[in-house]
């Protein structure tokens, strides 16, 4: 239930996220990693892509047939670049002219917005991929969008703010949907049972996956209350299937320290609820282009030469006895290997900056770069990252950390 990003090495370079078969166990079962890329006005990735008109301009054409043809081309481009779903279109309502995201939304009219939503997602489907309608729901402003409570009557919600989503779902043109950052009447959208289950699945018959927006927050699915981006328990209970995102290679080791495992132990989350999310994710993968692609293991262990034990330069840590390396203030340490073999590198890191900051550190072994550690700021908190597999010989490896400066 954890997606990884941005620019995950398992999928197309420069895209927003990978989800699905991200752990060694899931990959061994033959579950691939699906790919999603930012949109909606074209495909965002490392290489070249086609720029499309913004949503407001498309709706001003009053021509859903033309919009569907345009997005059929977009679907073909997604398919050709091995991207399974575009993170768009945005189908929220133009509630206020100063909303910073109005450019990507269609209009202030629910029916026009819904018609264009069906046309664009239908075109992507015709082209061989899927579109992700967002932001579900009532995402009407950019200022304070992480915490502004959208207080609204049920009648207005259904007749105005949900209609464009409802039309696309009932047309059968979407299999992926993204929730909003904001709470609605006190319940965060990413863990809102009424939205994700009662209305979306039970009333509208939606059978695809639901994902959060990037680094979204959730709160108690019943009581509401305080929000947290680690509350995957209530996300899953609401039937929101995928948390977007944790650091690359962080899904298997729970790098975001979410409450999934502890909630199972406490009896506040059931295996059945997790299985329900897994079923939704696997069903999407079976309907996506990724199921047609060859299953390729991108995490192939690379071999690194050791040096004799008498060439150890720093404090020595034995891989079998210590099972870890602690770097000193000079960012140096020596790793001793008694038995050659394949090992997985897992690191605990802390970066005393906000999430908006980024840092990169090379880990050099005997003068050769062995692994690159990339992270956003963690506000001084410790997180865990699973990095890569390596083949090591008997002997020692003199390790040194090297900060990469922009």
Regions found by a protein language model. Give the residues of each.
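Glycoside hydrolase catalytic-domain context in secreted enzymes
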Residues: 1-342, 362-370, 376, 391-398
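Extended, low-complexity, turn-rich repeat/linker tracts enriched in Gly/Pro/Ser/Thr and Asp/Glu
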Residues: 79, 350-359
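Contiguous beta-strand segments within globular domains
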Residues: 344-346
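Aromatic- and Gly/Pro-enriched, solvent-exposed loop/edge beta-strand patches characteristic
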Residues: 378-382
